Amino acid sequence: MAKWQRSFFQPVLPLGEDGRRVTGSKEHIALSRMAAGEGMVLLKNEKNTLPIRKGTKVALFGKGTVDYVKGGGGSGDVTVEYIRNLYEGMKIKEDEGKVEVFDKLAKYYEKDIQKQYADGAVPGMTVEPELPDEILNEAREYTDTAIITICRFSGEGWDRKCEAAQDGYVLDGEEKRNSELSAKIFENGDFCLTNAENIMVEKVKKAFTHVIVVMNVGGIVDTKWFRDCDEIQSVLMAWQGGRSEEHTS
């Protein structure tokens, strides 16, 4: 069993001739961040809504604002020292003078998601909270630019509804748990928006002049809801870019 020792003790012992931990070195963090940015795909950008102009005020909508998914489940998961979500990344950009963020809305999502985590939820497997009209109206008074983030968590055997079990494939403990949880959270399947996400998106579309969507997903998802929608000007397929994706310029 000695050969498996590194799998059970994270982070592993320092590597490299100078004793640095190569896997978590500053050089690799910078490379990972660059790769995350280069891997993103701008699916839609009407009226040159992106890039956001310097000094723009923004309101961040959707649980994905703080419920960031860095990668896949099972063998697609990795151990990292920290994870930076969209809100945290945007606050860094605010400190740099590039944007201004409506904090009250982001804090609302942060409080809700932290409670769901405390109750046993994992990133990407959380319920979209109801968007209070009071906060929506305050956000609309603050800015005319909204950023909606949709997130999904993917893993073997449970991130899509299928008939695999009929072919003799048996889900293990974690797969079975996640499959059951996914069916409960994503009543339309995680390929589509949930009912709560649809309601949130419709509210934002009606309230804001400029609407940007960020897709923090690891697999194929439905695009009909934004493809031919004039109220949504820009869509960024951000995928799942590791621990610092949301700090990508």
Pin down the residues of each PLM region.
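C-terminal non-catalytic regions of proteins with extracellular/luminal or membrane-system context
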Residues: 1-249
